């Protein structure tokens, strides 16, 4: 799924698909689904995001996927283009984009299986 979200007042083209968790694991040496589960648990228990890093990583990868040639190779370079708390403030939109993408994948799977 492709789309655009706003981070720090800037329109950022994003792409999320089945390869996103694979890119996440290869680049950050961490399991994407486990990281997202931890974030969801923290949000449920405390209402806060305690660790911003998985969100920064996800946002970077989804911004990198549609245009890898014009996206900085280092996440630090990409993040430097935004104000300090902008990823945190955009995290609901980042999650919403990922969830929409994941929902579309589940929808397609149901249609293929005839359910």
Specify the residue positions occupied by each region the protein language model found:
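Charged interaction scaffolds used for protein-protein
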Residues: 1-11, 30-47, 65-115
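Short linear motifs in exposed loops
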Residues: 15-17
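Short histidine
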Residues: 19-22, 26
